[in-house]
Design a protein with these regions (language model features):
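Conserved phosphate/pyrophosphate-binding and hydrolysis machinery centered on Walker-type P-loop NTPases
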Residues: 74-77, 144, 163, 167, ...
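Conserved RecA-like helicase motor-core motifs
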Residues: 180-190, 340-341, 349, 394-403
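C-terminal helicase module of SF1/SF2 nucleic-acid helicases/translocases
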Residues: 32-37, 302-306, 310-313, 388, ...
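Cys/His-rich short segments
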Residues: 309-391
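Short loop/edge segments at beta-strand edges and connector loops
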Residues: 188-189, 203-204, 319, 399-402, ...
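Short glycine-rich anion-binding loops that position phosphate/pyrophosphate groups of nucleotides
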Residues: 206-208, 224-225, 321-324, 419-421, ...
């Protein structure tokens, strides 16, 4: 029976596959995933072979089919192409951007010889090895963990993919893997080596698409990190792709983090292992800003002044200005006003009501602690923050911006947004001047994102340093849990909030924006599978499951106007 190739063309905006006949001279070289050149509308374009079918399955008569012109390169393995099909449905996406992530960035005429070390086989022992043998799960580690035990246990099962949140982190893990004696390929730079066969393939989020012969295990490092999710549409998350790929391949998946997300915990169930260093965090000090008379107008508290005046300490001060919550507090007792449903900071649209920007719950302006009906906005006075710090410290303070390249050698106190944690290489103390801006932000993952920020600070000071957290909500379960070394109360509370609001991982969420958002929202509102809340320029779509959400989005007729669909939006 004559075979045809169903090709996904490498053309922006085109997702419909086209059928082409396979000439005899290409029959042996052309496989699912191959990069090919095909004719399309009187020109020749590149594409990927999505599937190979009998000619009788084509809607076009064989005599009318055009031929594949040539095979240009090795492409993603067939199992990766199938994974791309799943991901395109899951994130309401075209396949092209996903296939690009899974393909080499240059022509690869053929795979090379495999390079496996003798160290990649042999049974290892311990709780992590036992977890891997039973299908994988979550490994909770310490902030400064080098993940040697995880790497050794995973690679001992056979070829392994290791996904890290950043290229720099991936490079460190690759160096560690080579030090342990394993053959290692960095993805995507060493795509050919990865596809030919090595002990371990390491890379940032795109490594989850690596073609790996005889895949035996997938490890995701720092699964909590937002960098593992693509910001542009499709907003796929490497953690979720890794879990699905492991399921399809019947191999273990290991999600590693000092602060595992609810999504990871929900997937793993009771398959959670804590390493010996899991509780080895630096000293954590919670500073209650409301006990200071200047609490509403200044971030320079008395404990902070004491730290700054110790000139032997290198201090980093963090204030995330972008996207911060404008908090309200009781004018009488200073209690921060929070939503009774989801815990976010509320705002005051009029004299009689406060409203939650996260879940839209509304209630009268009454303090939940003392009954007062007067609120005040907490202003942080950031315009002269550096000058205030410098005056308090009696030594130079350098402001760090994302564009800052060189540090002032005379400075030992630094202040900036989150970028300061990446520009300064070491510190004795990291001070979060106003963690409430993250902790109470109108995003359902606010507490997880605040934990991520605190973790970056913990890694900067390591075990011998100190983490100082200034807050107006000192009894928040995230802060009390961190101080006590036990986040179980926070996890329980967060599970309850998300279950009530049908938020991931107990439901599915998408954000529709752009000029055509109203049209798409109107179509979705007619579906029994989803709930739609339309705002000024965007719509939030909720469903009981990812399958229900995907089915509803797939049934929408896309309007001509621009529409962006972000499934599982990172900042909703």
């Amino acid at each position: 029976m004559t075979k045809i190739a169903r090709v996904v063309v490498d053309v922006t905006g085109v997702d419909k596959p086209f059928d082409y006949s396979i000439p005899d001279h290409l029959a042996d070289d052309l496989v699912v995933g191959s990069r090919v050149r095909v004719p399309l509308h009187r020109r020749e374009v590149s594409g990927w072979v999505g599937s190979i079918l009998d000619a009788r399955h084509s809607d076009v008569e064989l005599s009318r089919l055009l031929e594949v012109r040539k095979v240009t390169s090795v492409g993603p393995a067939p199992d990766v192409v199938e994974l791309v099909d799943w991901a395109a449905h899951r994130w309401a996406s075209r396949r092209r951007p996903l296939l690009v992530a899974a393909s080499p960035d240059r022509r690869v005429p053929r795979r090379a010889a495999a390079r496996y070390s003798s160290r990649s086989s042999g049974e290892t022992h311990g709780p992590i090895a036992a977890l891997i043998r039973t299908g994988g799960g979550v490994v909770q580690c310490g902030p400064a963990s080098r993940h040697v035990e995880v790497l050794s246990a995973a690679i001992s099962t056979g070829p392994t993919i290791v996904v890290a949140p950043t290229i720099a982190r991936a490079g460190q893990l690759a160096a560690e893997s080579r030090r342990l004696g394993f053959t290692t390929a960095m993805y995507p730079q060493e795509w050919t080596a990865a596809a030919s066969g090595v002990d371990v393939v390491v890379g940032a989020r795109s490594a989850v698409w690596a073609s790996v012969p005889n895949l035996s295990c997938i490890v995701v490092i720092d699964e909590h990190d937002d960098s593992l999710q693509e910001e542009r549409s499709p907003t796929w998350h490497a953690r979720d792709v890794a879990v699905e790929r492991a399921r399809r391949s019947s191999v273990p998946c290991v999600l590693v983090s000092p602060v595992p997300t609810l999504s990871a915990r929900h997937w793993a169930g009771d398959r959670v292992v804590a390493t010996d260093d899991a509780n080895q965090w630096p000293t954590i000090r919670i500073v209650d800003r409301t006990v200071d008379d200047r609490w509403a107008s200044s971030l320079v508290t008395s404990p902070l002044i004491e730290l700054l005046r110790d000139h032997g300490k290198r201090v980093v001060c963090v204030l995330n200005v972008k996207g911060r919550a404008r908090a309200l507090a009781c004018n009488a007792c200073r209690t921060v006003a929070r939503c009774e449903s989801c815990g976010a900071a509320v705002n005051q649209p009029d004299e009689q009501h406060v409203m939650c920007p996260r879940c839209s719950a509304s209630r009268p302006v009454v303090c939940s602690s003392c009954g007062s009906q007067k609120m005040r906005a907490i202003r942080v006075g950031i315009t002269r923050l550096r000058e205030e710090l410098e005056a308090a410290a009696g030594r130079p303070v350098q402001e760090i911006a994302p564009s800052t390249e060189l540090l002032n050698p005379a400075a030992s106190v630094f202040v900036g947004t989150e970028a300061v944690l990446y520009r300064v290489d070491r510190a004795d103390v990291v001070v979060f001047l106003d963690i409430d801006a993250e902790l109470l932000a109108p995003r359902f993952r606010a507490s997880e994102q605040a934990l991520d920020l605190l973790l970056h600070g913990a890694r900067l000071v390591a075990n011998g340093g100190e983490l100082v957290i200034q807050t107006a909500v000192p009894h928040h379960e995230v802060l009390t849990g961190l101080a006590a070394g036990d986040l179980s109360t926070h996890v329980t509370a967060e599970i309850g909030r998300r279950e009530r609001l049908l938020l991931p991982p107990f439901g599915a969420l998408a954000e529709v924006s752009g000029k055509g958002a109203a049209d798409v929202a109107a179509q979705l509102a007619e579906s029994l599978l989803v709930q739609v809340a339309m705002g000024n320029d965007r719509a939030l779509v909720r469903a009981e499951s990812w399958d229900a959400l995907s089915e509803a989005l797939a049934a929408v007729d896309r309007p001509k106007e621009r529409v962006r669909i972000a499934v599982d939006p990172p900042r909703a």
